[in-house]
């Protein structure tokens, strides 16, 4: 009855917002979700699987870490397996039979980000694009997939290699490596691909993967892979000593999907969004000028802002935090922050949405035919070391 009467308008929503000195948090529940919800595809992927608190290989040095639950029995995941088998028959009909209940993607702390930040600060988006083009092989980004069957994982990797070498012979070189008695594989370009990359000035690039009985890690950064292997060794050591594993330093807010982002990547986002936000704020600020000029020039109201407020019960505010003042030379109102179209000003402090935050956490949980979303923004407190 609810869906037939109200589905075109809204879902039933309950929300709680908490604001204190250290953080802002929101907890939103939507129950039930309508049948044609935009979240339906995500729900079909995660199914009834719930994330374990320590799933995803959580670790302190991650700058951003995203994780999602996987229901390998769901129609979506079954279709993914069938598509893989269609394109690469050697993988078999049950290509992803080794996959467990989650996958995650993370980026770790690295000098790469400091260099990237300098390129962004110097040349903005163009600098970022050029830097990524030249240094993609150093990108400290990794993919983790939980493995439940090491034998099926081994068969999958062997079939994948055979398919690659059959479809693109001589284009890749596969070599086995070892780190602290832990094996991993390096896939490097060869032949024409290698020559083309060298001609374009791209530094060495390779793909690395390390399988284990419980996890498959794939990355472009060998150092990142070694860190992952170190964590595996530490976990095995604790297990042998019958000691508990360390708790997730950045707990997942959702049991179906979660993401956590720290201050360094937040600052990058701020840089990329700053120009666009400033343009939007300037445009909104200038949108108020025509009516103020109308009151001033045609109706003779010396305090056009006060007249507008009294007449329409709406206070016109400059989104940049400035004031509206009369410019006698140009015969127009202007913002003390953005100026006016005939004499624009550059804000001393560009618009910044997330500048005051050191970490952002967000999570989704699908339960009881509905959705629960949690989000927390951790503030950067004065005199705080981090």
What are the residue ranges of the model-derived segments?
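Signature of soluble extracytoplasmic/periplasmic domains of secreted precursors
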Residues: 1-386
